Amino acid sequence: MLNQIVVAGAIVRGCTVLVAQRVRPPELAGRWELPGGKVAAGETERAALARELAEELGLEVADLAVGDRVGDDIALNGTTTLRAYRVHLLGGEPRARDHRALCWVTAAELHDVDWVPADRGWIADLARTLNGSAADVHRRC
């Protein structure tokens, strides 16, 4: 059986990362995640992530630059793997289209977020990414 890849985007702005509050399924509704979705047959992971983020956040694919991986793969089940990538927002303003709400959170706030269980595995990696962003812009988050 083929392994389904699901990609998630860590959209970083300054010292914050964008998180999205789920609407469904009922057992995950109200919890927060990095936005993203499934890679379609014949699609690269980066192209799939740009497409999914554009659809979910009301952006254009040209507004997004998908960068390096963040953290390790997370096995959702025996046939599905979740992967995160850092994403640079080149234009546009994200809007909640498929989610209840969006929120920009700092590294200090990551542990306070009511994450979907799978995304909890990236908290330390996201904190390192955000703290690295702070060093890049010569300010402390």
UniProtKB/Swiss-Prot annotation:
The molecular function GO annotations come to:
8-oxo-7,8-dihydrodeoxyguanosine triphosphate pyrophosphatase activity; 8-oxo-7,8-dihydroguanosine triphosphate pyrophosphatase activity; 8-oxo-dGDP phosphatase activity; 8-oxo-GDP phosphatase activity; metal ion binding
Q: Which GO terms describe its biological process?
A: DNA repair; DNA replication
Query: So what does this thing catalyse?
Result: 8-oxo-dGTP + H2O = 8-oxo-dGMP + diphosphate + H(+)
- Domain Nudix hydrolase intervals: 2-131
Task: List the ranges annotated as motif Nudix box.
Answer: 37-58
Regarding protein family, the annotation reads: Belongs to the Nudix hydrolase family.
User: PANTHER family attached here?
Assistant: 8-OXO-DGTP DIPHOSPHATASE, NUDIX HYDROLASE FAMILY PROTEIN
Q: What is this protein called?
A: Putative 8-oxo-dGTP diphosphatase 2
Could you tell me which species this protein originates from?
A: Mycobacterium tuberculosis (strain ATCC 25618 / H37Rv)
Task: Output the lineage of the source organism.
Answer: Bacteria, Bacillati, Actinomycetota, Actinomycetes, Mycobacteriales
The record's gene field reads: mutT2
